[in-house]
Amino acid sequence: MLFIGASLFFCGMAKADAFLNVPHFQQQTPVWCWVAAAQQIIAYKRGVAATPPQCSMVEAVDGASPSMCCGVGHPGCVHTGSFVQVANLIAYFGGSFSSYVLPANPYVIENTLNSGRPILAQIVTGSASTHVVVIRGIQMGPNPLLLINDPMAPAPYQIPFSHLASLWIDGIVVN
């Protein structure tokens, strides 16, 4: 999880120089940040009512029979996913293609968000682990703040760009 101690505060709707109303969903297992991040983007693109549950998306990725992950709750369904799988879920369920991008500077983030395109950031959380968050807003200034949908957190929060930049290893821009 990306909680930053004193620099973290929860917010309903922060004033931002660029802001997208991407719905926030928490991950339903300890390792489904990738599915929850994709679900957030699909809900932004198609609406919450047209967004499948996380377990259905895992079934689709795994090629599992319907209700294997949702109904039975098979332990094989609880696994990590790749950034490619996130992009594929967004294309399949959300009808939107994605571009892979390197970590960006605040001005690129602001321009991307102002064009209506959310950004998924893959961040390092340990020596061999990563986490996926959705960047949905930025407040510019001497020390820019990002508005993040973190699937592990109960609500969106702001984080200094400089902190996220030190952890950010890969990105997806949803077209």
Where is each model-derived feature located?
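N-terminal signal peptide c-region/cleavage motif recognized by signal peptidases
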Residues: 11-13
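Active-site nucleophile-adjacent alpha helix/oxyanion-hole segment immediately C-terminal to the catalytic cysteine
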Residues: 16-66
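Conserved active-site-adjacent core of cysteine acyl-enzyme catalytic domains
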Residues: 20-21, 42, 56-175
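Bacterial N-terminal signal peptides
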Residues: 1-9
